[in-house]
Regions:
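Short amphipathic alpha-helical interaction segments
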Residues: 203-217
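Generic leucine side-chain signal with a strong bias for well-ordered alpha-helical environments
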Residues: 8, 187, 213, 221-222
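Short, amphipathic alpha-helical interaction segments positioned at domain boundaries
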Residues: 235-247
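Generic detection of well-ordered alpha-helical segments
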Residues: 70, 181, 207, 237-240
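Minor-groove-contacting beta-hairpin "wing" of winged helix-turn-helix DNA-binding domains
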Residues: 228-232
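C-terminal scaffold of the Radical SAM
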Residues: 1-203
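A short, conserved structural fragment
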Residues: 217-227
């Protein structure tokens, strides 16, 4: 297969560096065009959470997670994979279009099935009662410019719903919401914050963004190119924390 993608999880209970390196060696045998790697998250209320609380499993600390991530990125460099997002790596020209669509925060997408998410921009229309109804709100002046819908995760409820009446949760997003989401995703990518998109922001958001960038540039966490502000490789693992500077 010339278009294989593999998902990996590190930070498993009691996983040491040797075991993680052995898993990466096994991946190398398949030579996938793309791979994603995520640190294991203990979700509250899950079986794993109960087992960890009962000390049946011992979860690694942040220092171990950082070390395992370092092993991963070093391995990817040796194997010729581009780390184009904190958790995603690809051979040249093989970035995941599926993942990239989510991170763009502009492109609409449709989610089908239990737990699936959809996103689309609201049409720019005259703010009337009819427009409010079309946008799914009684208040056309709430500032929302986009909708995100999440189908409920209950499989039985989803399949038993009448046709066209699937149950979902809905989030209305303002320009500020979309700006914050863009910052959070862009700082995680190799492409960084696009200068053209910053220039197109509403004036208040553009001014705030440029002001918030400066300390990160001064401290060497971001660097500037002709077209973007990008997270340094060393700081990209901390991208979620860096995004807090923009809130």
């Amino acid at each position: 297969c010339d278009n294989l993608s593999i998902d990996l999880i590190y930070g498993l209970p009691d996983m040491d560096a040797a075991e993680w390196e052995a898993q990466l060696a096994e991946v190398a045998a398949y030579r996938p065009s793309h791979l994603s790697a995520y640190a294991l998250t203990v979700e509250p209320g899950s079986l794993l959470a109960r087992q960890v609380a009962a000390r049946q499993w011992r979860m690694p600390g942040q220092d171990v997670l950082a070390a395992q991530y370092g092993i991963l990125t070093d391995w990817c460099d040796r194997q010729g994979y581009e780390g184009y997002e904190v958790s995603n790596f690809a051979l040249p020209g093989r970035r995941a279009r599926h993942n990239s669509r989510y991170w763009d925060i502009r492109t609409p997408y449709l989610g089908l099935g239990p737990g699936a998410h959809s996103f689309y921009r609201l049409p720019t229309v005259k703010k009337t009662a009819d427009a409010a109804e079309a946008a799914g709100t009684e208040n056309p002046d709430d500032g929302a410019v986009a909708l995100r819908r999440a189908n409920l995760p209950d499989i039985r409820a989803y399949v038993s719903a009448p046709h066209g009446d699937s149950r979902y949760e809905q989030e209305r997003l303002t320009e500020t919401d979309l700006y914050h989401e863009y910052v959070m995703t862009a700082l995680r990518t190799a492409d960084g914050l696009d200068k053209g998109r910053i220039a197109a922001l509403p004036p208040d958001l553009r001014t705030a963004c440029l002001q918030n960038l400066q300390p990160l540039l001064t401290n060497g966490l971001l660097y500037e190119t002709e077209t973007a502000y990008r997270t340094t490789v060393a700081a990209r693992y901390r991208a979620d924390g860096l995004a807090l500077a923009f809130f």
